[in-house]
Swiss-Prot record:
<dbReference type="InterPro" id="IPR018280">
    <property type="entry name" value="Ribosomal_uS3_CS"/>
</dbReference>
<feature type="domain" description="KH type-2">
    <location>
        <begin position="16"/>
        <end position="85"/>
    </location>
</feature>
<dbReference type="Pfam" id="PF07650">
    <property type="entry name" value="KH_2"/>
</dbReference>
<comment type="similarity">
    <text>Belongs to the universal ribosomal protein uS3 family.</text>
</comment>
<dbReference type="InterPro" id="IPR009019">
    <property type="entry name" value="KH_sf_prok-type"/>
</dbReference>
<dbReference type="InterPro" id="IPR005703">
    <property type="entry name" value="Ribosomal_uS3_euk/arc"/>
</dbReference>
<keyword id="KW-0699">rRNA-binding</keyword>
<dbReference type="InterPro" id="IPR004044">
    <property type="entry name" value="KH_dom_type_2"/>
</dbReference>
<dbReference type="InterPro" id="IPR004087">
    <property type="entry name" value="KH_dom"/>
</dbReference>
<comment type="subunit">
    <text>Part of the 30S ribosomal subunit.</text>
</comment>
<keyword id="KW-0689">Ribosomal protein</keyword>
<dbReference type="Pfam" id="PF00189">
    <property type="entry name" value="Ribosomal_S3_C"/>
</dbReference>
<dbReference type="InterPro" id="IPR036419">
    <property type="entry name" value="Ribosomal_S3_C_sf"/>
</dbReference>
<dbReference type="GO" id="GO:0019843">
    <property type="term" value="F:rRNA binding"/>
</dbReference>
<dbReference type="GO" id="GO:0006412">
    <property type="term" value="P:translation"/>
</dbReference>
<dbReference type="GO" id="GO:0022627">
    <property type="term" value="C:cytosolic small ribosomal subunit"/>
</dbReference>
<keyword id="KW-0687">Ribonucleoprotein</keyword>
Length: 211
């Protein structure tokens, strides 16, 4: 019963995330943090432009609240909006900008390289961008772009790398955009830090010196 409830909550959060992703395109939507409280459900929305989430005179946030209660059966939803501190270190926002550029007809290589420069310029330890689909012809293919240091497997890849998957709808078909970012403050398991300090001379002690 507990497992079924847990799965149900995860499915619900995923559906809400997808709803916000389509509804808050102009806001530069990143992700949500959903927590249940004794009086209801607190949903924190992280976005590049919080003003678009709130809307004019609070119209948008009111619409979102009503939709969550009616269509997603969220108990007494309370929406809080927070601004993403550095959009160029957020894989969801970076991926969305790449997808939007592709939909406007920008070349995928130019778009990817431009995104990588912004991410690395913001201090990221590493970034990986994968674009897959019908990019310039009838045949589907995958193009990978990377800079810096990146963990691709194991526990470090799960714990230290933030990733997001976005879709771009082009005339030739749907193109997938996967962005992985390793942020500046990440400490790797094999990373060694040498502390600077005063070096003191140690005099060797022995019983002979006492005699």
């Amino acid at each position: 019963m507990i497992e079924r409830t847990f799965v149900g909550e995860n499915v619900s959060e995923t559906l809400i995330d997808e709803y916000f992703k389509t509804k808050l395109v102009r806001a530069g939507y990143s992700h949500i943090d959903l927590k249940k409280t004794p009086i209801g459900t607190r949903i924190t929305v992280f976005a590049e432009k919080p003003g678009f989430v709130i809307g004019r005179k609070g119209k948008m946030v009111k619409e979102l609240t009503e939709t969550l209660a009616k269509e997603y059966a969220v108990k007494n939803p309370q929406i809080e909006v927070k601004q993403v501190e550095n959009p160029d270190l957020d894989p969801a926002i970076v991926g969305h900008k790449i997808a939007s550029s592709l939909e406007r007809g920008m070349h995928f290589r130019r778009t990817a390289h431009s995104a990588i420069r912004r991410v690395m310029g913001s201090g990221a330890k590493g970034v990986s961008i994968i674009v897959s689909g019908k990019l310039s012809g009838e045949r589907s293919r995958t193009e990978k772009f990377m800079d810096g240091y990146m963990k691709h497997c194991g526990e470090p890849a799960e714990a230290l790398v933030n990733k997001s998957h976005q879709l771009a709808k082009l005339k030739l078909g749907v193109v997938g955009v996967t962005v992985k970012i390793m942020k500046p403050d990440v400490t790797l398991p094999d990373e060694i830090t040498i502390l600077s300090g005063e070096i003191k001379e140690v005099t060797e002690y022995s019983e002979a010196s006492q005699e």
